[in-house]
Amino acid sequence: MRFGIPLGLVRPDAWHDLAVAADELGFDSVWLPEHLVLATGGGMQGYPGGRAPIRPSTPLYDAPVRLAALAAATRRVRLGTAVYLLGLRHPLISARAFATLDEIAGGRTVLGAGAGWYRAEWDAVGAPFAERGGRLDEAIGVLRRLWSEEAVAHGGPHFPFPEVAFEPKPPRRAVPILIGGESPAALSRAARNDGWISMPAPPERVAGAAAELRRLRAEAGREGEPFEVVAHAEGGCRPDETAAWTAAGVHTLIVRPWRRGRDALAAAERFARDHGLAPGAPSDRARPARPAS
């Protein structure tokens, strides 16, 4: 089992030290959430699965920029978004942001994407909330082409553009795209891409979704292709609980083994010790060779 750390659940001024510790302790990944804006009206709602409304004063950051800073401070740990709202932005902008991040990170980026649930963001940028799924699908297709083809023109309904060149490509000429969410549409979208990210949930609920993903991928003839299931635990994970997550089909478990954010660093150290984590060599995810330009 690989373990990840949700940086968004501690204060931003702790992200650097916690990410560096995760890198040194043997965690697999660190993850940042993403929102563009928060409404100030009385209709503010909480994160699905959460218990309290999100405060409008909550600080928000550009996730690829913050992850790039963490990439420069780490050597091995993967850097992911959970999740990034691709459909809110033109894919040329997102493609550039994540290609730049992945260049700095040496191929350690994971793009977790979602259609979104918070309508106020869409209203703020003038994008139709009802079209968020189609915009996400179209954006994903554009990103994959920009990262792999020499020149790209796109005629889709949401983001048409004339032929352009896009350089540099990401080190792998791709960035893994995982889809977050538990709706039928989200699972179907995840099955067409590189992986799935759960909401905070117990292993038995994740197991049901993972089984459905296996069915969807088998129907599409993709069961032999790489696919990552990332689950959010509802808190930590004791060593004797790991087997249940493995049986549920989880490859990477995002854990929060602390009750208070100020205890996160010490809790991560205890977690790594209890689970026998050990850092892998930085070359495990070294930058692949690229032809000279």
Feature map (PLM): residue ranges:
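Active-site-adjacent structural elements that line small-molecule/cofactor binding pockets in enzymes
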Residues: 1-293
